[in-house]
């Protein structure tokens, strides 16, 4: 009788061994549900951003400040998220993926629950800063977790990471679907933002629980901090891979200790000769898309209120429809065609089409309200299908695991400057120039287009994880 033998176990003695295993093997369960759970912090980020954008004018009235100052206070979450993104790598390296997920979403939950009962504008400011730190920490975690689940060289990894853009618009649509029943149930219009933000805090708690159960710890992190037995357990449970710990050589032990002392670094490497162009491309794509979105997408309900009849109910219904038809659909189509076009070309085409749509809107906005609505929908669609999610996708797929959270956190931090610019400066520009402001806004996607033309880097399918040993060696210097 023949005996069935199990496959030979992998032997691991250094972090690169675990990285290579994860790179070659997708997790056993990488369903769309698991991907969305990993991207859960982005859902909360989108939800709270849209909710506070909706509540901006009500916050100004309730606390006796100007709409411009209210927008500045609300934008404090972006400044805090910028700082949180820069600190994300330290938090992840210190606490690991599992606890860092709890820290990020925990801060967001506390801030959201507290801002819902804010008695004054200073309370709002402090709570928004707390939320921002949490969201800034969470984003690099989320995209890094998806990359680990899929394996960085898998053809599905780019599409999975880029699903965060579709997730963003799903969450934004949920905002309006939450506000509508609250409004119809008799909640005072000026109190809607408080109820909506509190509902967001409940969503954040649910995301925390789901992540704790279904995502867990990172095998790569466990290996980097020397917990090889734990890494073997994670590989067995999540990837169905059998691995055993081999005794490291003395030189590997010394190298590991040196790397651990230097592990908090990494920002300098983002601009060395190998990674400079990758960093610039990811940051510019991310920043320009954030600028154009926060100028158009965040103020969509206010724009539609001037186009459609039906008051606030009509504006909320129209916003939900535009986000669902154009944003969600665009994000889904963008993920499906990503393998064919690649991140750079898809970003380039998206920026070009948004530029054309903005120029058309500047020329034709006053001719027909429904034409304006169609052009706004086109901007949302081409943004979502094109560069909307690809700045972060480029950042996630351009760096090996040791500096991946650093690269994503840095790109996300720089991206926040574009979001702040769109959120604060667009209303000022609109107040002075009205529809002619669209001409000036078209400069933003055009700069993104030029960057994609000039920098020829395509991370999709590149085996960047193989560069991890070299990065660790550079960190030791």
Give residue ranges: language-model regions.
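Transmembrane-helix signature of 12-pass secondary carriers
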Residues: 2-477
């Amino acid at each position: 009788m023949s005996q069935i033998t199990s496959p030979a176990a992998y032997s691991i003695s250094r972090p690169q061994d675990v990285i290579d295993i994860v790179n070659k093997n997708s997790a056993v369960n990488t369903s769309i549900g698991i991907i969305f759970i990993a991207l859960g912090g982005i859902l909360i980020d989108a939800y709270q951003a849209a909710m506070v954008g909706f509540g901006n004018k009500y916050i100004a009235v309730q606390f006796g400040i100007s709409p411009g100052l209210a927008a500045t206070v609300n934008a404090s979450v972006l400044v805090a998220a910028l700082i949180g993104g820069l600190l994300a790598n330290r938090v992840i390296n210190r606490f690991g993926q599992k606890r860092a997920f709890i820290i990020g979403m925990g801060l967001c939950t506390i801030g959201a629950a507290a801002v819902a009962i804010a008695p004054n504008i200073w309370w709002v400011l402090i709570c928004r800063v707390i939320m921002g730190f949490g969201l800034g920490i969470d984003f690099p975690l989320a995209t890094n977790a998806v990359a680990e689940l899929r394996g960085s060289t898998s053809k599905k990894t780019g599409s999975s990471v880029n699903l965060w853009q579709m997730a963003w618009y799903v969450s934004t649509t949920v905002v309006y679907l939450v506000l509508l029943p609250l409004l119809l149930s008799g909640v005072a219009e000026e109190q809607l933002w408080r109820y909506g933000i509190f509902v967001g805090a409940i969503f954040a708690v649910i995301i925390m629980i789901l992540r704790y159960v279904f995502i867990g710890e990172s095998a790569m992190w466990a290996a980097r901090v020397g917990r090889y037995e734990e890494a073997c357990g994670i590989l067995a449970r999540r990837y169905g891979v059998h691995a055993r710990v081999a005794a490291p050589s003395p030189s590997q032990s010394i190298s590991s200790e040196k790397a651990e002392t230097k592990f908090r670094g990494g920002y300098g490497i983002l601009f060395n000769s190998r990674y400079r162009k990758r960093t610039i491309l990811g940051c510019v794509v991310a920043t320009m898309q954030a600028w154009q979105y926060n100028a158009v997408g965040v103020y969509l309900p206010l724009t539609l209120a001037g186009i459609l009849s039906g008051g606030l109910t009509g504006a909320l219904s129209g916003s939900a429809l535009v986000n669902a038809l154009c944003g969600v659909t665009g994000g889904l189509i963008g993920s499906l065609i990503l393998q064919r076009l690649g991140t750079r070309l898809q970003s380039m085409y998206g920026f070009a089409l948004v530029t054309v749509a903005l120029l058309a809107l500047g020329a034709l906005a006053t001719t027909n309200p429904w034409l304006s609505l169609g052009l706004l929908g086109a901007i949302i669609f081409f943004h979502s299908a094109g560069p909307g999610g690809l700045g972060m996708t480029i950042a996630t797929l351009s760096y090996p695991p040791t500096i991946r959270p650093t690269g994503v956190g840095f790109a996300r931090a720089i991206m926040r400057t574009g979001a702040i610019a769109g959120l604060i400066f667009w209303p000022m520009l609109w107040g002075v120039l009205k529809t002619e402001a669209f001409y000036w806004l078209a400069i933003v996607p055009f700069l993104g287009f030029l960057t994609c033309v000039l920098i020829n880097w395509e991370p999709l399918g590149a085996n960047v994880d193989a560069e991890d040993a070299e990065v660790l060696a550079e960190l030791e210097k």
